[in-house]
């Protein structure tokens, strides 16, 4: 049998050994059923899809909505290790949906965020078919997906948020897990402009410079929307992240602490962007397990 090719890694992963890429924990596929390509929304650019993972031994299971990363410009529900992640959660008794959303630069904020909001509303309406409890919803996202997950969790539980809103009500949002998430978009844009890290794709997502649309930049930043009543958050970040500097994410955690908002913040020494898929070793595995247990605890999963 020939060996699998070693993938080429993007420059922002630094000097990680490519042979270490992969999801480090086992997934028991016998414990869940998967349905792919469900249409949750029609748009002018075609339908938007999600994949559903339903635990075989659980009815009315807590639901986790997974939002992929890719700097808001690329990626999809079937990429970036999400299928393994979804299976890992579903095998622990959590119903999971992994969603697509329209990408920049063709789609700008708030339309891509509206897609994520609409996906949650669709899941509430279709909860019975998903084997899910619509009153217990958790959010999960990595990178840009972590940003959208945090924005959804913080904004929808405010009365004064001017952007897209859930029809179903925000009280059902019980927890959010965000891996290396952009949280202060203006700051991230400034860092990228000076060549000090950060993603230069933020402007493409917003569609204007901060000076031209300051309200839109503030509206789209979880740091600006954070408040004490937001759902509990688990935030995970590496110190060698070249896209989302760890000081950026630490500032968000500090803001949550100042507000008295429930949260956990884990900073992984030497962790790169995507560290849970490339190490470092035992700590990454422990944090993956913690992410699953956090969702189970906060959503009240049985067993």
Predicted segments with their positions:
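Alpha/beta-hydrolase superfamily serine-hydrolase fold, recognizing
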Residues: 1-303
């Amino acid at each position: 049998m020939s060996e699998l090719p070693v993938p080429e890694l993007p420059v922002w992963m630094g000097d990680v050994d490519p042979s270490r890429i992969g999801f480090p924990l086992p997934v028991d596929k016998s414990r869940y059923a998967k349905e792919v390509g469900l249409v949750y929304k029609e748009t002018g650019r075609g339908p938007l899809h999600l994949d559903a993972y339903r635990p075989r031994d659980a009815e009315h299971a807590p639901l986790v909505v997974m939002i992929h990363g890719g700097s808001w410009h690329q990626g999809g529900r079937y990429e970036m290790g999400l299928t393994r992640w979804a299976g890992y959660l579903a095998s622990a008794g959590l119903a999971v949906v992994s969603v697509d959303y329209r990408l920049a630069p063709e789609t700008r904020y708030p339309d891509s965020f509206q897609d994520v909001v609409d996906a949650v509303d669709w899941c509430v309406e279709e909860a019975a078919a998903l084997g899910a409890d619509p009153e217990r919803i958790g959010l999960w996202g990595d990178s840009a997906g972590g940003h959208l997950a945090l924005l959804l969790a913080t904004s929808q539980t405010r009365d004064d948020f001017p952007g897209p809103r859930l029809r179903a009500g925000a009280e059902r949002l019980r927890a959010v897990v965000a891996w290396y998430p952009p949280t202060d978009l203006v700051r991230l844009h400034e860092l990228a402009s000076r060549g000090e890290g950060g993603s230069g794709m933020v402007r493409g997502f917003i569609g204007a410079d901060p000076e031209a649309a300051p309200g839109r930049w503030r509206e789209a930043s979880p740091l600006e929307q954070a408040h004490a009543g937001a759902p509990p958050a688990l935030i995970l970040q590496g110190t060698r992240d070249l896209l989302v500097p760890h000081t950026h994410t630490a500032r968000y955690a500090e803001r949550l602490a100042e507000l008295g908002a429930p949260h956990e913040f884990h900073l992984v020494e030497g962790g790169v962007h995507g560290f849970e898929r490339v190490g470092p070793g035992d700590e990454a595995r422990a944090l993956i397990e913690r992410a699953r247990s956090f969702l189970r605890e906060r959503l009240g999963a049985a067993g």
